[in-house]
């Protein structure tokens, strides 16, 4: 009986880590109190995993901010600007993730990128010319010792050296090969220390191997591991992969002197085929059979069919990836049992892994019978009218006329905006008062009339403030919305909403993805009321703010009984109806956010178009294809790497696109120029995910850099994302500087 998981959620059952850490950020508790609370949380989580009967428990999967950042700190991959800050280790650690602005200095946060095809974001380390890779941290050892004191001999988890190098940035003139020997020495020192502490096995996460690999990348991988595994310091090595299959290196991988290999049998298209072709008898196979990214119950019969085909003798059942990507437990939900029985969050997935192992070993007949019964019953019916509407779509439904160049001229005449028009991405700070009023309204303590009056007053205040500082295109602030997906889902059929289904997105920020239960249609107008109200309060244009269909799908837990393409088209038709209602209400600039467009892009380039972009881009076009030429369509995208899909983004046929660029040093601009990008662009001129306020002249320099790459007539000036999570003082100070910088830049044109 051998079972494990790749990793466990770390925010806590009720987001305890988030709230404690935020108290620390506000200086309400000490560093010692934060560390003590985190220690208690780790003990609680280890105990849950143990009590569920999981036989191998991981450690060091916990993080105060991000596991990739933990590895950077462990191996001294820290910029000199942060190394030199006169701060504690923990303060420097947080400075890397959040930036630091205070009496000890002023440093920007490191860039942040999507973690493969998930909604989790990792902090991107940077190798500089003087970076000295060495063992500098002790977290992995401390947490192993903590668990040992609780009577648990855990398996420490660490990002592998290949993935670390592949996903990091490098200063000009610096390359990954420069650090092979120093990384090998540092990892071997980790091995030795863990062995001395009594560890028997370490898990090295090498998810980068599921992507397309060049000959040079394969050579780097083999060079690293041939050297590293030459001396394992008496420790067994589990080579763990997830998010896909390792077809490019499988033959090499099985011949490396590792002791165990973890493979993904959920998302790995070719994993079963590879293993059936042969797996070494002297190695243990960790079978990722329970989906770590979705919340539906595992179909035991289907999983057992896969397990029966695996020829390996030594098997450990595990999750397909870390359970970080699903909520904590269904125990705190209020769904009817008929609904709840279909869901498995992190704690319930422990049960599933244990059940499958028991069934495989001739036990667990009751669990198998109950699971069969669950899947034998039809879960939900279909909407025949909606299915017919989709079946009737033609190419014309995906094509906006006239073409972009003609629309651009029409809109220039219609809006008469200045050069370098200024705007924001949509949301303004959601203060304690805003959240308290929303909660009171939900509880029935505030009437509809009272709540509407509060929202109107708040919108009025921010519309006037935007006019006072002379923004060109305004937003209403989204004060009525709790979340950019849940708010829409609450007005769509086919959606369910958890009470406590939080999932970590970046740092201490959690999101609560809704669940797509059935067919999706719009129940009523969603945004028209407040967007049209805001427009009535000013003569300047106010953007209508919508979330696009691909993002709504990608930031929800999708159905598994129909394709994500079909689900997305259903959502697209619902949002299309909303776009047309906004236009009819006099809202002439409509932003359709596709923040998560890249999120489900297949990790292998050969699958990009056929499996995703060939339907995701048309789904966006479907939403806006029938608006008038003088209605301007904006879209926005968040932290992702877009440079390799620029033609697809241009093909969305929006009129303006804004995107994150500040943390990544505007690298995307070179690609826009090279690809002759036609859509007008708003590269984010400052990073809103850090509380840091841009220095005097900082935004001016960013605008200057943008104008060196993009014609001024194509450029908009905006922050890189919405301002919902920021405080009012820092928001206003930053936006005043943004408007001033835009005006100064206009003077130079």
Swiss-Prot record:
Cross-referenced Gene3D superfamilies, in alphabetical order?
3.20.20.210
UniProt-annotated binding residues for 5-methyltetrahydropteroyltri-L-glutamate: 15-18, 114, 555, 599
Q: Name one GO molecular function term.
A: zinc ion binding
> Which Pfam families does the entry mention?
Meth_synt_1, Meth_synt_2
Q: How is the cofactor bound?
A: Binds 1 zinc ion per subunit.
Pathway noted in the entry: Amino-acid biosynthesis; L-methionine biosynthesis via de novo pathway; L-methionine from L-homocysteine (MetE route): step 1/1
User: What CDD domains does the record tag this protein with?
Assistant: CIMS_C_terminal_like, CIMS_N_terminal_like
This molecule's function is given as:
Catalyzes the transfer of a methyl group from 5-methyltetrahydrofolate to homocysteine resulting in methionine formation.
Query: Which residues hold L-homocysteine?
Result: 425-427, 478, 593
Q: Which residues form the active site?
A: 689
The answer to whether keyword Repeat applies is: yes
Which example biological process does GO assign this protein?
A: methylation
- Repeat in keyword set: yes
Keywords in alphabetical order:
Amino-acid biosynthesis, Metal-binding, Methionine biosynthesis, Methyltransferase, Repeat, Transferase, Zinc
Name used for this protein in its record: 5-methyltetrahydropteroyltriglutamate--homocysteine methyltransferase
What the record says about family reads:
Belongs to the vitamin-B12 independent methionine synthase family.
* Binding-site residues, Zn(2+): 636, 638, 660, 721
Cofactor(s), names only, from the UniProt record: Zn(2+)
Q: Which residues bind L-methionine?
A: 425-427, 478, 593
Catalytic activity from the UniProt record: 5-methyltetrahydropteroyltri-L-glutamate + L-homocysteine = tetrahydropteroyltri-L-glutamate + L-methionine
């Amino acid at each position: 009986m051998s079972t494990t998981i790749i990793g466990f959620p770390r925010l806590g059952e009720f987001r305890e880590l988030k709230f404690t850490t935020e108290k620390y950020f506000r200086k309400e508790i000490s560093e010692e109190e934060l560390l003590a609370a985190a220690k208690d949380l780790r003990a609680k989580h280890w105990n849950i995993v143990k009590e569920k009967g999981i036989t191998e428990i991981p450690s060091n999967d916990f993080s105060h901010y991000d596991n990739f950042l933990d590895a950077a700190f462990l191996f001294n991959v820290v910029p000199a600007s942060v190394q030199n800050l006169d701060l504690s280790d923990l303060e420097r650690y947080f400075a890397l993730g959040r930036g630091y602005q205070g009496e000890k200095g002023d440093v920007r946060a490191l860039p942040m990128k999507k973690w493969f095809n998930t909604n989790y974001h990792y902090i991107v380390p940077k190798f500089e010319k003087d970076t000295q890779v060495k063992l500098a941290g002790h977290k992995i050892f401390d947490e192993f010792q903590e668990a040992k004191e609780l009577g648990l001999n855990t398996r420490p988890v660490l990002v592998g050296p290949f993935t670390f190098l592949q996903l990091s940035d490098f200063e000009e003139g610096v390359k990954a090969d420069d650090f092979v020997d120093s990384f090998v020495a540092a990892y071997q020192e980790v091995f030795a220390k863990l062995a001395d502490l009594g560890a028997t096995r370490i898990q090295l996460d090498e998810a980068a191997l599921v992507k397309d690999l060049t000959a040079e990348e394969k050579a780097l991988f083999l060079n690293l591991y041939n050297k590293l595994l030459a001396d394992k310091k008496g420790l067994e090595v589990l080579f763990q992969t997830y998010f896909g299959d390792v077809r490019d290196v499988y033959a090499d991988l099985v011949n490396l002197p590792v002791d165990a290999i973890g493979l993904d049998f959920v998302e790995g298209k070719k994993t079963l085929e590879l293993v059936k072709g042969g797996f070494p008898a002297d190695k243990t196979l960790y079978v990722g059979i329970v989906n770590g990214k979705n919340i539906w119950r595992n179909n035991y019969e289907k999983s057992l069919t896969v397990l029966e085909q695996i020829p390996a003798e030594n098997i450990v059942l595990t999750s397909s990836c870390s359970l970080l990507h699903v909520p904590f437990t269904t125990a705190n939900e209020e769904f009817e049992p008929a609904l709840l029985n279909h869901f498995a969050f992190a704690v319930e997935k422990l049960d599933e892994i244990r059940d499958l192992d028991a069934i495989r070993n001739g036990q667990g007949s009751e669990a198998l019978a109950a699971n069969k019964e669950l899947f034998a019953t039809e879960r939900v019916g279909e909407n025949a009218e909606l299915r017919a509407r989709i079946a009737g779509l033609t190419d014309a439904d995906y094509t906006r006329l006239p073409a972009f160049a003609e629309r651009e001229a029409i809109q220039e005449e219609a809006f008469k905006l200045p050069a370098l028009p200024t705007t924001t991405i949509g949301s303004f700070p959601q203060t304690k008062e805003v959240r308290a009023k929303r909660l009171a309204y939900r509880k029935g303590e505030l009437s509809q009339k009272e709540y509407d009056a509060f929202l109107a007053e708040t919108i009025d205040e921010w519309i006037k403030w935007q006019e006072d500082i002379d923004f060109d295109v305004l937003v209403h602030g989204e004060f009525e919305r709790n979340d950019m997906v849940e708010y829409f889902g609450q007005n769509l059929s086919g959606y369910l909403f958890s009470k406590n289904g939080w999932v970590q997105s970046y740092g201490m920020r959690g999101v609560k993805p809704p669940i797509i239960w059935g067919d999706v249609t719009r129940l009523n107008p969603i945004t028209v009321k407040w967007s049209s109200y805001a427009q009535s309060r000013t003569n300047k244009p106010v953007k209508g703010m919508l979330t696009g269909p691909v993002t709504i799908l990608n930031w929800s837990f999708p159905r598994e009984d129909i394709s994500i393409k079909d689900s997305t088209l259903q959502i697209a038709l619902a949002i299309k109806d909303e776009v047309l209602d906004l236009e009819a209400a006099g809202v002439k600039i409509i932003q359709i956010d596709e923040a998560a467009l890249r999120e489900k892009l297949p990790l292998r380039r050969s699958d990009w178009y056929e499996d995703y972009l060939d339907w995701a881009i048309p789904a966006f076009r479907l939403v806006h294809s029938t608006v008038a030429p003088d209605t301007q369509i904006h879209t926005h995208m968040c932290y992702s790497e877009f440079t390799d899909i620029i033609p697809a983004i241009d093909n969305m046929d929006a009129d303006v696109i804004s995107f994150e660029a500040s943390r990544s040093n505007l690298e995307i601009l070179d690609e826009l120029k090279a690809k002759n990008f036609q859509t007008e662009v708003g590269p984010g001129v400052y990073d809103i995910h850090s509380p840091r306020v841009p220095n005097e002249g900082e935004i001016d320099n960013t605008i200057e850099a943008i104008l060196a790459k993009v014609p001024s007539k194509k450029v908009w000036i905006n922050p890189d994302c919405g301002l919902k999570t920021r405080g009012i003082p820092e928001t206003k100070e930053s936006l005043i500087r943004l408007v001033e910088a835009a005006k100064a830049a206009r003077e130079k044109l």
